[in-house]
Amino acid sequence: MVNVTRTFFPPINEFVTQIERVYANQWLTNRGALVMELEEKLSRYLELEDSKVILMNNGTIPLQIALKLLGRGGEIITTPFSYVATTAAIVWENCTPIFVDIDPNFLTIDEDKIESAITDKTTCILATHVFGNPCNIERINQIAHKHNLKVIYDAAHCFGVKYKNKSIFEFGDISTCSFHATKLFHTGEGGGLYVKSIELYKESYYSHNFGHNGPQNFDGLGINGKMSEIQAAMGLSVLPHMNFILKSRKNSVDFYDKNLNFSKLEKMKLREGVEWNFSYYPVIFQSESSLLFTLSRLNAVGIYPRRYFFPSLNKLPYVDQIPKINSESISSRILCLPLFFDMELKDLDMIVQIVNS
């Protein structure tokens, strides 16, 4: 069976070594030594210059904290083409998602349509760097500055991505990332919040720790968003293998690029200035019927791509279902092909043959 992705498991002896440290420290959670070590190592690996990272227990909690701090119950301009967590976090935090359609080439929010969606209730722009492809950061920053809005980037897919020689996590007021087991770098389950402002860092920190600033001081409202030492142990075991993981995925991407027939398929256009991370391989069919036919043929031989992202989020039952033509069209026709470390050539070849036929 070939799934759309496969979790990278580090050598078990390396993971056991980290777990033995947890036992030696007799410390399982509450900002332990392994969590703090992983924060430091990630900052170095990602070459963060201005931002600091706070590790959390999953990839959605950072979004919820960002929206609690910056959304303030207002209208959030956002994309309908993302994983459901992006919209769910907005609604969960009692904010209102205002969907802006996407650019059909880059698949990110169409920056030219943002200003017309701004009202006196708008507090924030929440945009997703889809499949690791950056939004038009400069234009979004200009709009936010002009209208005194905050910017949150859902960078769940973006571990290792650089934009104009800087980590993608350096942009926006807050950026968030997922370290779920399906991601390039993972901690089994986990996530990170990246922030430049010292004041906003402090607010984000106490927000993920019940509001604590020290054992007996409370600086504000908080929840339990802390990463455990077991999660950090997995992250510390995976991180040394990132070069191998990226190289392997690039080889698979190169094979797809070289062998797929793009006369009947479209590819996502990467934005100029991006150093991509080979996180997903989406292809866009000419029609939903051709996608479904191809999907059924792949499934018949044990190959399971995913319809990321389907449906378009403006179709969710708990939001105002206002049509978004580009997002709905792309969502119905896009398929992410299997992509993970150490894919076998025979599997890649079979996928290409079926898709091309």
List the model feature ranges, each with a label:
Residues 64, 81, 135-136, 160-161, ...:
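Short N-terminal helix/helix-N-cap motif within the alpha/beta-hydrolase-1
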Residues 1-71, 127, 145, 332, ...:
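Conserved PLP-binding active-site segment in aminotransferase class I/II-type PLP enzymes
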Residues 105-187, 194, 336:
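Active-site phosphate-binding strand-loop segment of PLP-dependent enzymes
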Residues 35-41, 45-54, 112, 124-128, ...:
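PLP-dependent aminotransferase class I/II
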Residues 93, 146-147, 301:
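Helix C-cap/helix->beta junction micro-motif
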Residues 66-118, 124, 297:
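Conserved PLP-anchoring active-site segment centered on the Schiff-base-forming lysine
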